[in-house]
Amino acid sequence: MIRDSLVYWTQNLGVDGFRFDLASILERDQNGNFHQGSQLLWELKNDPGLAGIKMIAEPWDAVGGYRLGYPSKNVGWDEWDAFWDTVRKAVRGDEGQMTALKEAILGSPGIFGSTENGREFSINFITSHDGMTLNNLVSYKHKHNLENGEENRDGHSSEFSFNCGVEGPTLDAEVLELRRKIIRLMHFLLQVSNGIPNDSCRR
């Protein structure tokens, strides 16, 4: 059913790529154990109706699985990796991040095997549909999901965000300029890094 749906969207609706949220579950067997050579991944890789279609894997799943590096190595899928967390922590000044930042800029060769593979398989981004927007990332130190009835329990607690000295909106010109500079720095790192950049925008 998954394969047939992807082929339909590709051939009838013109979709040219798919991102699999919690993709590691696709590598589990009927008992929930990870195994090499997932039948579904093999079928998707070899289906002629999906030839040339971009496949992107999020390397974790809902029950704690983490398979970073496996989809790219086993079936040639692109992958989310640690780029976003690394850049966020490095830019806000966390200690001990320079080696990880270098690895991220090179395209995570430690994960993908080489800088050439990183150029092909590493999906680099600062923000996504999960968590804070780019503007909130430099405006808040903590999440404030207070208006939806969830009492701030929803959403990520480990955003690695930084408020530049003021929590939330401000008219302070120095704080606003610092926020703009940090956003530009993160965009610079995104664009010069080996891999496939996303289209993070300030909102």
Task: Give residue spans per PLM region.
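Hydrophobic, small-residue-rich alpha-helical packing segments that form membrane-like cores
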Residues: 1-2, 41
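Conserved alpha/beta catalytic core and glycan-binding cleft of carbohydrate-active enzymes
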Residues: 30, 35-203
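Active-site groove signature of glycoside hydrolases
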Residues: 3-29
